[in-house]
Amino acid sequence: MANNAQGKQDMGTGSVKKLMVKMAVPALVGQVVNLLYNIVDRIYIGHIPEIGGAALTGVGLFTPILMLITAFAMLAGAGGAPRAAIAMGQGDKDKAEKIMGNCFTVLLILAALLTTVFYFTCPTLLRLFGASDVTLPYAVTYGRIYVLGCLSVLIVMGMNTFITTQGFASISMLTTVIGAVINIILDPILIFVLDMGVAGAALATVLSQVVSAVWILLFLTGKKTILKLKVPNMKIQGPIILPCLALGISSFVMVSTESILSISFTSSLARFGGDVAVGAMTVLTSINQLITMPLSGICQGGQPLISFNYGARKYDRVKEAFFCQFGVCVAYTTAFWAVLMVLPNVFAGIFTSDAALVDYTAWALRIFLACGFSVGFQISCQQAFMALGQAKISLIMALLRKVFLLIPMIFILPLFFQNKAFAVFLAEPVSDLIAAAVTTFMFFRFFIRMMKEGKALQQS
């Protein structure tokens, strides 16, 4: 209790910059580890002799299915964990354990369904996404092996949140770190030493997820956990599971739109630019994550500080915390964007040794990320909306870029340009700039009004 009280006192009186660093660094480390998990396969695959470019393109085409699997995991995990936390806060541990058990059962059912559906429909879906005769074999090989490990993927993504919600943030982070380290070690062994190629990359990912899943289950059934995973609690009960799924719908929709966005890009680029354009998009997506994922870590550090002081009506500290978050996000994206614009070939070369793909990606990068500096404005303001309790406007601003701007522009802009592939890539910076301008304007209008009202309330 003393430590908890001290923590609250620090949030309200301690140095804002020091607190920001203290809270952002662990989140940033977690995001970087997640980033490695996401891109390490692609880096190794892109450097497989002779087939690297085609193999990388094939694996990139599987991304929409991977995102859909993630979305279903979020449906149970992102919806169930907060419900369990609320039950714990109410002192109802039994209900919290029933929530966790029910969510686990839902994940098992989803794993069986998704494995069956995606294993058999994989070739057809990948064709629809833009796979060619050259890239389809690599996409199917990677996809089917990954799908066979769907159970462990869902457990990791869906159940790790129940560890975090109990306050075991370090254990939760270790889940990701363990999987990432094993994946990084196994990738070169299976891909190059055992000469398994794309199949080796998929197997490395699945095995690392299996180890992470076992780690989670051992913890949730062990002595240290507060909430225990018990068989009797796994019986589905409507009043228990339905509120969890209802809460998880928002996260499900957000991740699902990423899948739709990925399909829109790959199918359009396959039509207008062929395999090399789709391969470039795979690399660009990974490079874009180098921009966006660290921003999430920075904002995760800033959110509790902004929220606490907003609740405590310490508006000067809210202002200081926001501008600290805003400044770091904008500085990072601007600096990284400048380096990308100067050295596009270097970054493209990290992911593949295919000369033609490197050259095309370097050309596409300067178009696709032309307004990459603006992402810092949009994400920092959107996340600040969330920190100030404005969840609805935050969701609208997040959907603005993807659903209302980017996806339509992918199909509209090629109507006005002779170089259709150029137009598809151009959809990204146009959407980024508009979304950043609108989000920043909306936030500062709200923020200035909030500060004035807050100061008036303090003086009255």
What residue spans do the PLM features occupy?
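Short alpha-helical transmembrane segments in multi-pass integral membrane proteins
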Residues: 1-26, 84-151, 193-248, 306-371, ...
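Hydrophobic/aromatic residues in alpha-helical transmembrane segments
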Residues: 25, 41, 80, 121-122, ...
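Helix-terminus/linker motif at the lipid-water interface of multi-pass membrane proteins
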Residues: 32, 36-56, 126-133, 189-196, ...
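Interfacial/gating helices of multi-pass transporter permease domains
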Residues: 45-67, 134-138, 198-199, 240-247, ...
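Small-residue-rich hydrophobic transmembrane alpha-helices
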Residues: 56-116, 153-172, 266, 280-344, ...
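Short runs within selected transmembrane alpha-helices of multi-pass transporters and secretion channels
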Residues: 146-164, 172-180, 201-214, 296-299, ...
